[in-house]
A protein has these predicted regions:
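Low-complexity, intrinsically disordered extramembrane tails and loops of integral membrane proteins
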Residues: 1-11, 277-315
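Nonpolar helix-loop interface/hinge motif
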Residues: 1-55, 112-115, 161-244, 248, ...
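Alpha-helical membrane-anchoring segments
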Residues: 30-38, 130-139, 143-144, 201-207, ...
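Membrane-helix interface segments in multi-pass membrane proteins
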Residues: 43-89, 140-163, 216-260, 312-350
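Short membrane-interface loop/juxtamembrane segments of multi-pass integral membrane proteins
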Residues: 71, 122, 191-193
Length: 350
């Protein structure tokens, strides 16, 4: 791993942010991937074992459906899959995400951090991080119900849901780990940062979504297509399904190990960029000795909250409405293309 680049903070354009995130990712590839792999690989092995146990019992259930309540392999595999999913939420979404955020921030600010050092650096901040993510999940349910409220909900609900899940939620980890915010205050703080540059942040998120489609979703779809043909030669469909499940899980493992650190680096950098643009974070760092971690932590602490800041202003409602209408318009556009192709293709063939 190379030494971190000298600390030079300034407002960055979208392309510069992505370039900095990729450079940071490349310089610290082993560290960033290792932080995620330390907890994700063992859990994925358990997940593969659980899924294999459950899938291998499907042959028995297909021939004897009445044995579903006595097929302990099936229920054991299902229960263990649920347990592993719960452990992944704690260890990956909570602890590993917190450690990765700490490693990205430290290296971006000019401090070398090891894998174990990143885990030690988060302290107990993973607990409020988990709480905040659970609260985000509850809020997403509330926003989904708000979406079906006539008139105002119809035109703002989808936009609110999109912003919460794609922009505010990823910003929670830097806010909790780097600023020490609590469960509720971290979500409000993350929203406060996002709303300051609403459309540039969403544009940034959209570009990252395209990245994820290319790195994660794309290989998965290709693998599914290849496996569907290659494993069709198995006489035993259950064996083919088990092998397909294992290979798909391995592809998912590799994709996440490669992409998730890049995603967290990108969101941590836009967090810093928002603070540089709106709070003078870069100027504050120039006034202290950055070789002392205590000084950095002091500057990192969020400024006092603006007591008269409304949670949702009129301009925010307008942005939500525009986003909702844009999403609906894009959906209608693609559906029209698909339906048009379905109806026009037969006539063109004739």
């Amino acid at each position: 791993m190379e030494n971190p680049a000298p600390l030079t903070l300034r407002p960055l354009r979208l392309g510069e942010l992505l370039d900095q995130a990729i450079r940071l990712y490349r310089r610290n590839f082993i560290t960033f991937v290792g932080i995620v792999a330390m907890v994700y690989v063992p859990l994925m092995v358990l997940q593969i074992a659980s899924t294999t146990l459950m899938t291998s019992s499907l042959d028995t259930l297909t021939s004897s459906p009445e044995q579903i309540f006595t097929n302990y392999a099936y229920w054991g595999g299902m229960l263990s899959s649920l347990v592993v999913a719960f452990l992944q939420f704690i260890f990956v979404q909570g602890i590993a995400t917190g450690a990765l955020t700490r490693a990205v921030a430290d290296n971006y600010l000019g401090k070398t951090t090891s894998i174990l050092g990143a885990y030690r650096g988060i302290g107990k901040s993973w607990l409020p991080l988990l709480g905040a993510l659970l609260l985000v999940g509850l809020l997403s349910i509330v926003f989904a119900f708000w979406w079906i409220v006539p008139c105002i909900g119809w035109i703002t609900g989808l936009g609110m849901l999109v912003v919460l899940l794609t922009a505010v939620s990823p910003m929670v980890a830097p806010v909790v780990v780097l600023e020490g915010q609590g469960v509720i205050s971290s979500i409000r703080r993350a929203w406060s940062l996002v709303r300051r540059r609403f459309w540039p942040v969403l544009g940034y998120v959209f570009v990252l979504y395209i990245f994820s489609m290319l790195i994660v979703t794309g290989p998965g779809l290709i693998m599914n297509a290849v496996l569907a043909g290659a494993l069709g030669v198995f006489e035993d469909p259950t064996s083919g399904l088990v092998i397909r499940t294992i290979l798909q899980s391995l592809v998912q493992l590799i994709s996440i190990l490669l992409y998730y650190p890049l995603q967290m680096a990108a969101f941590t950098l836009i967090y810093f960029d928002l603070r540089v643009r709106t709070e003078g974070f870069d100027i504050a760092l120039l006034t202290v000795d950055v070789s002392d971690q205590a000084n950095i932590d002091q500057v990192m602490a969020a400024p006092a909250a603006v007591t008269n800041e409304r949670l949702i202003a009129g301009s925010d409602v307008g942005n939500f409405a525009i986003l909702t209408l844009a999403a609906v318009g894009i959906y209608i556009f693609f559906i029209s293309i698909i339906m048009g192709g379905v109806f026009l293709l037969p006539s063109l063939i004739r």
